[in-house]
UniProtKB/Swiss-Prot annotation:
Residues holding Ca(2+): 261
GO BP, sorted A to Z: mitochondrial calcium ion homeostasis
Gene: MCU4
Motif (Selectivity filter): 257-265
Designated name of the protein: Calcium uniporter protein 4, mitochondrial
Reaction it catalyzes: Ca(2+)(in) = Ca(2+)(out)
Amino acid sequence: MVMMKKLLSNRLFNMSKTASQSLMNCRTSSSSSLAMRTRVPKDIGEATIDPEPGDLTISQRFLNKFSMNGIDTTSKMSIGESLMEKLKEMDMNKDRIRLDGLSHPKEETLGLTVQDVKKLLRAAEIEVIKTKLMETGKIWIRYSDFLGVCSDSSLDPSQGALIAKMLDDSGNVIVMGNSVCLRPHQLTKSIEGLLPLSQIHNPNDPRRKELNELEAIKTVIDQKAHSLVRRELWAGLGYLIIQTAGFMRLTFWDLTWDVMEPICFYVSSVYFMAGYTFFLKTSREPSFQGFYQSRFEAKQRKLMQSEDFDVGRYDELKKLFNPKPSGAVPKILGSLQN
């Protein structure tokens, strides 16, 4: 019996020692404070019974494990709920068009590039310069004056020589030495008569024979018209002679000068009005030469109509085989010599 009591007391002592060590090694201060409160009685007279050390340790471990499991479960639940919400949002938004993620299509700009703007400005400058050159009313000007117009009308005066060269290369003007032709079309028409063409000088060309026939017919018509006009002129001269003789008779024999003076004045006024009317109708000087040309053309037209003469065909063939240079040719030759 004594031995059994000693063994029992040793086991209890070892158990209490182990419990105290576990209490000292506990990580939470709350458990240690709780153990101290259970071991220390509130009142001195109150008897307390110490709990079993093993039971306290087991309960503390269970509480710690429960608290950790609760925290893990809560965190797992929160993570799972957030994941489910994300999945639901993705499922709800899978059929929706995300406008914020779409990029706007590139609009096709129809604007002008820098090169296009430069071309338009250069074309506008050239048109302004051409207008100013035409406003001068001249056919030929000096190259220095031409260069001055190009420089003054350009946005950049230093580009005047370049614009002048562009006008010359494009054929808008023709630069010949120190002279510039502002109307190249007139120059080309004038030089056409100076350029020999092999086709024109072909003696077997049937058009040349046709021209010769028309010229023969026209020569006959011109002779007839000339003779008719000459008759009219002789008749006019005879009329003036008779009128002058009649006025002399009335002035010196039948009537007096006082009577014939106003009559001669009014007759002269009638002749003046007739000459003025002739000028208005024909735009020619009221002279004998002008009257002759007017009457000759009138008679010539009548005879051509009566002979069925093709004036258009005759003018075309004459221009082709016998071109006449215009009056600008001497000016051109003079400018080339200078």
